[in-house]
């Protein structure tokens, strides 16, 4: 996962370290499509929201962008998962 300085700053403002965000990928997670935005905005097609847990058990939701390299994601931002997002993970 790649993260820009802006993404690291956004995570930090929410009390999430980049290492905590990366831990989520090695634990159980689900990926949902980004439903925000209009059909005219490309974000809707290239952004995904992985929902999972860090090693400490904290539920996180990240916003990632698909890159030209299929095994590499660009981290945009993230937050502590909402109750609805946690439910998506638990039901998966």
Listing of model-derived features with the role each one plays in the protein:
Residues 1-92:
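Ribonuclease/tRNase effector modules and their secretory precursors
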């Amino acid at each position: 996962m790649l993260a820009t300085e802006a993404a690291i700053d956004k995570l930090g403002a929410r009390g999430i370290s980049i290492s905590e965000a990366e831990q989520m990928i090695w634990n159980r997670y689900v990926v949902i499509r980004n439903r925000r935005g209009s059909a005219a905005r490309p974000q809707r097609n290239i952004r995904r929201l992985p929902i999972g847990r860090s090693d400490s058990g904290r539920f996180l939701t990240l916003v990632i962008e698909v890159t030209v390299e299929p095994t590499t994601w660009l981290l945009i931002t993230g937050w502590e998962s909402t109750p609805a997002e946690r439910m998506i993970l638990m039901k998966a």
